[in-house]
Amino acid sequence: MINAKQVPTADMSCQLLYISESQACQVYSLQALIAEHELSIILNVERYVDKLNQKRRQQLSQESTQPVLLLDDKNKLSWLSDGLSIAPEWDKLQRRVVSAGRKSELLLQATKMTADSKVIDATAGFGHDSLILASTGAQVTMLEQHPLMALLLLAEQQRMSTLPNWQKLMSRLHIINTDALSYFARFNNYLEADNEQAVDVVYLDPMFPEDSYQDSKTGKGAKVGKHMQALHQLVCPPTLDEEQKLLQSAQTFVSQQAQKQGRVIVKRPQFAPLLAHLEPSESWSNEAVRFDGYFV
């Protein structure tokens, strides 16, 4: 994510609703994650005893003056956004993760990941693409600027790590609450001095205007899903100047870190303009999405 509308500079308050006294350990684990990763979040914890139907979810998300988080009966943490429970839901990607390969995933064609690769997903969002990247055996560092989104990612990683079939994949994901530009500047010298940590690929999936999903001439294109609708509440599309800074810093970073040819891969809707108006070295696309590659 980039250009967050309200990335907190001080601690933000979130209401956390849980439904059972048996969830005390899970509530404590969430608070421990916040402390360990220094997230600027304060949880106002409350047990919710009434039936939490769709109408009540809608009321809670509309009436609350702070973000509302829900810990459900399966200990899945979600964010109530316009009455919808928004969560990474990594378990729903199991079939795709298991079958992921270059034949089925344009992302893997573009990144050319191997088990020895190291990649930075600099705009992690809900982490779905990070899972596909990590399915190759690669190590994936996930950067997420907004603390609320970072908490959802960390909680999902913690939950999925309890499932035996997911533990190895979860161990290859490294989630950091920071923005991409700060990370590139902060870690450049460290990575340059340690070849074992050298990065092969930087992956960017910045927010774009909602009308980018459709062809301006025909009106055809992909519909915006609930996850993307929720992100639009937290994030503004970057300005042209911000796009240029992001792409340039990513190119500079990977050119200094990669042991051989490095690449920056940018995900765009099929009909979206080029990031920073810069022509890529190569592109891969289908009917819905396009990956632009910048080789350095």
Swiss-Prot record:
Gene3D superfamilies, sorted: Vaccinia Virus protein VP39
Organism the protein comes from: Psychrobacter arcticus (strain DSM 17307 / VKM B-2377 / 273-4)
Residues noted as binding S-adenosyl-L-methionine in the record, renumbered to the chain: D205
Catalysed reaction, written as an equation: guanosine(1516) in 16S rRNA + S-adenosyl-L-methionine = N(2)-methylguanosine(1516) in 16S rRNA + S-adenosyl-L-homocysteine + H(+)
GO MF annotation, one: rRNA (guanine-N2-)-methyltransferase activity
Family per record: Belongs to the methyltransferase superfamily. RsmJ family.
Lineage start: Bacteria, Pseudomonadati, Pseudomonadota, Gammaproteobacteria, Moraxellales
Enzyme class at the top of the EC tree: transferase
Superkingdom assignment: Bacteria
Name of the protein in question: Ribosomal RNA small subunit methyltransferase J
